[in-house]
Amino acid sequence: MATTVTCTRFTDEYQLYEDIGKGAFSVVRRCVKLCTGHEYAAKIINTKKLSARDHQKLEREARICRLLKHSNIVRLHDSISEEGFHYLVFDLVTGGELFEDIVAREYYSEADASHCIQQILEAVLHCHQMGVVHRDLKPENLLLASKCKGAAVKLADFGLAIEVQGDQQAWFGFAGTPGYLSPEVLRKEAYGKPVDIWACGVILYILLVGYPPFWDEDQHKLYQQIKAGAYDFPSPEWDTVTPEAKNLINQMLTINPAKRIMAHEALKHPWVCQRSTVASMMHRQETVECLKKFNARRKLKGAILTTMLATRNFSVGRQTTAPATMSTAASGATMGLVEQAKSLLNKKADGVKPQTNSTKNSAAATSPKGTLPPAALEPQTTVIHNPVDGIKESSDSTHTTIEDEDTKARKQEIIKITEQLIEAVNNGDFEAYAKICDPGLTSFEPEALGNLVEGMDFHRFYFENLLAKNSKPIHTTILNPHVHVIGEDAACIAYIRLTQYIDGQGRPRTSQSEETRVWHRRDGKWQNVHFHCSGAPVAPLQ
C-alpha cells in the first residue's frame, strides 16, 4: 500500500514565535530560520478553508511577490505548502507605518516628503517594470523597515495586485480603496499602471498637508469629486508649499491616464531628484498636527463601523427627526464612538480639508465646513465589486487586518438594498418596490395569514390602498443584520425591524417584526425573490 509523503519543509526549517497579525483565513507569526538565525514574518494560511478561487488568488499573490525584489518592497523569501496550511515567508518589517513615524518626528519638511515619495515611486517603478500593478497604494501599505532613523520605506500588501503586459489597458475589476481610486476605475473604463500613479498623487498631497485631496461624507459625492479631478490647494497651508511640489501633484492627479505622469518621469521631476535645492526645508508643524488626526481617524473608523452596523438605522423622506429606538448598551457604545470621532474630526486643525469655493474644477462636490469626512463614518477599506478578482486579503506581514473584502462588500450591498426596499415600502412607492423585487416574489407574511403568496398583486393592494395614502411619518430601524453570502449571485439577510409610526388617534407606536429576505443577482442587479416576516398582521409593516 502506497504511503502519502507529506511536505514538512517549513516545520523542519523554521521555528515559529509570537503572533504579529491575524485575519479570517490566516495568521502572521514571527519566525526564525534555524540554519541562519534570521528573523522573518510567516503568513500562515489555513488552506482547508479556501475555495478553488481563493487558491488561485493565493497563487497569484505568491507569484507576484516572487517577481518583486527591491529594497523598497516587502520581499517574499519563501512559499511553502504543507498539509492544510500554506506558508509565505516575508521580510520582518518592524518600523510600523510611515505615516505614524512622521508624526513622531521632531522635524518634518517638504524635503522629507520628497524623500518619502521618491522611495514609493522607486517601488512602483519596479512593480511596473516587472508588469505588476499594485492597485491598493495607501498609507496602511507604506511601512518602515525598522525603527532606526532613516529606515527605508517598504511597499506592502500585494493582495490586489495584477499582472499586465507592457502598457496594457483593460478592465480588471473594481478594486482599491475609495479615497485612492482613480477616475478611470470609477468610470469602469480600461485601466493599467497609471492607477498607481494617481494613488501616489493622493498620498503626496496628504504627505504635504496632512489631509486628503478628495473627501465627502457621501461616497457617491466623493467619487464625483475624483472623476472630476476636483481638488484645490487652499490657503494658508498650501501657501508655504513650493510651486514645484504642486506641479508634481497636478501631473499625478491628471484625469486622463494617457497624459498622467509615469513613475520614471516622476522620479526625474526636479522636486524629487533635486530636492536639496528645490524642496523647502521649513518645518511643517501644521502638517504634522493634521496628520496626527488623519491617522487617528484611520484607526477609529473600523471601531465606529463595527458598532454602528450592529444597530444600523436609517430614515426616509417623511420621517420625524426623533432618533430610532435601539438598545441602551448598543446606543451608548455607538454614541461614545461617534463623539470620539467628532472630537477628532470636526475642526480643520484635526486634519479635515477645509471646503473652499475655489476648486480646481467647478464640478467639485461641496460639503459644509466642519462636517465629518468620509474617513470617520465611511469605510476606507479595500473594496472589490468584481468576482473575477477573488478575495482581497491583506498581507499580514504588513501589520494590517486581513478580511474577506469581496464577501464584506457584498454583505454591505445586501444591507443597502434591503434598506432601499424598506424605504420604498415606507414611502408607499410601489414602482421603486417593484424594481427591487422579482416579479415572481414569494413570501410568508402575517397579512397572508400563513399562506405562501406569489407575485406582486397581493403587495400592490397594500401600496395602492394604504401605504400610498399614508401621510404620517414613519421611521424604521434595522437591528442586528446578519447576511449569508451564497455563492456569487445569491444572499440571505435576517434582521429585526423596528417601525415607529403614528396611529389613527395621533399616538406614537412602535412595532417589531423578525424578517428574512433572499436576494438573487440578475444582470448585475439584486432582486428580492423571497421574504418571511413574523408578527401579527399590522400595517404599515408590509
UniProtKB/Swiss-Prot annotation:
Topology in the lipid bilayer: Peripheral membrane protein
Binding-site positions, ATP: 20-28, 43
Record PTM Phosphothreonine, positions in chain: 287, 306-307, 400-401
GO BP annotation list: cell differentiation; nervous system development; positive regulation of dendritic spine morphogenesis; positive regulation of neuron projection development; positive regulation of synapse maturation; protein autophosphorylation; regulation of neuron migration; regulation of neuronal synaptic plasticity
Keywords: ATP-binding, Calmodulin-binding, Cytoplasm, Cytoskeleton, Differentiation, Kinase, Membrane, Neurogenesis, Nucleotide-binding, Phosphoprotein, Sarcoplasmic reticulum, Serine/threonine-protein kinase, Synapse, Transferase
Activity regulation information from UniProt: Activated by Ca(2+)/calmodulin. Binding of calmodulin results in conformational change that relieves intrasteric autoinhibition and allows autophosphorylation of Thr-287 which turns the kinase in a constitutively active form and confers to the kinase a Ca(2+)-independent activity.
Description of its domains: The CAMK2 protein kinases contain a unique C-terminal subunit association domain responsible for oligomerization.
Top EC class of this enzyme: transferase
Protein name per Swiss-Prot or TrEMBL: Calcium/calmodulin-dependent protein kinase type II subunit beta
Family listed: Belongs to the protein kinase superfamily. CAMK Ser/Thr protein kinase family. CaMK subfamily.
Role this protein plays: Calcium/calmodulin-dependent protein kinase that functions autonomously after Ca(2+)/calmodulin-binding and autophosphorylation, and is involved in dendritic spine and synapse formation, neuronal plasticity and regulation of sarcoplasmic reticulum Ca(2+) transport in skeletal muscle. In neurons, plays an essential structural role in the reorganization of the actin cytoskeleton during plasticity by binding and bundling actin filaments in a kinase-independent manner.
Modified residues (Phosphotyrosine): 17
Record's catalysed reaction(s): L-seryl-[protein] + ATP = O-phospho-L-seryl-[protein] + ADP + H(+); L-threonyl-[protein] + ATP = O-phospho-L-threonyl-[protein] + ADP + H(+)
Modified residues (Phosphoserine): 367, 394, 397
Source species taxonomy: Eukaryota, Metazoa, Chordata, Craniata, Vertebrata
UniProt domain Protein kinase: residue ranges: 14-272
List of catalytic residues: 136 (proton acceptor)
Protein modification: Autophosphorylation of Thr-287 following activation by Ca(2+)/calmodulin. Phosphorylation of Thr-287 locks the kinase into an activated state.
Listed Polar residues bias regions: 354-369
Organism: Bos taurus
Region (Autoinhibitory domain): 283-292
Subunit structure: CAMK2 is composed of 4 different chains: alpha (CAMK2A), beta (CAMK2B), gamma (CAMK2G), and delta (CAMK2D). The different isoforms assemble into homo- or heteromultimeric holoenzymes composed of 12 subunits with two hexameric rings stacked one on top of the other. Interacts with SYNGAP1, CAMK2N2 and MPDZ. Interacts with FOXO3. Interacts (when in a kinase inactive state not associated with calmodulin) with ARC; leading to target ARC to inactive synapses. Interacts with CAMK2N1; this interaction requires CAMK2B activation by Ca(2+).
